[in-house]
Amino acid sequence: MSSSAVFADNAGHESPNFPLRVVDGLTLPPEYRKALRPGEEWKDATGRGRQLPRYFYEIPSWDSAMKIELASHFLLWEFIQVDVREAPPLRTFPRYVPCAITLLAVCLERFREAVGTMVHISANGGYRSPSHRFSKNATLHSWGTAGNIYRIGDTFLDNRSAIERFSLIARETLPGIWTRPYGAPSGFAEDHLHLDLGYVLSVPRDVTN
């Protein structure tokens, strides 16, 4: 049996405090591999190749997603809200999210502490697969390391003043965070605050290959 197969069989036992099973994307059924493209290269807007995540958390049900905390004030469901633009296999359960999603949750928790109020992630603004209709140019959302925030407390982020104010707080609070500038052209944002951690690949410690 290959080392990756052994890992898949034993997945879920290396993190006793976290309830989700880790899976090797290369061992998933064909329809999931086609949608997730685990470990494949995807070119960004500059033509540079970026390696897609290979290891994922398996979410068994929406009920599980509604209950599992990724951080003190963030539940898993907030990061996986998608609509019909997502690939059909990934609109039902089980669902799969890159392991790096936990890093994004920790950063958003720290950001929430800095702003002192609730932080709301947009629909289609957390994880979305490479097959999602919004996904292009190696979007960081397909790594699970980007979040689009549409509202903070009672403030909707639909104007320059609000977006730039909270963007500054994010950059001052989170070392290495990147935020989209305000504006309408591609690469800008005018109706949300985009935060991302870059192309992070999270590989579980028990992987041997």
Residue map of PLM features:
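Extended, low-complexity, intrinsically disordered C-terminal regulatory tails
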Residues: 103-136
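Catalytic cores and adjacent binding grooves of peptidoglycan-active enzymes
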Residues: 6-18, 138-209
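N-terminal secretory targeting signals
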Residues: 1-57
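A broad, structure-centric signal for solvent-exposed, well-ordered loop/edge residues
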Residues: 59, 66, 130, 134, ...
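N-terminal start-of-chain detector that recognizes signal peptides
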Residues: 93-96, 118-124, 164-170
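Active-site acidic/histidine clusters and adjacent loop/turn architecture
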Residues: 58-115
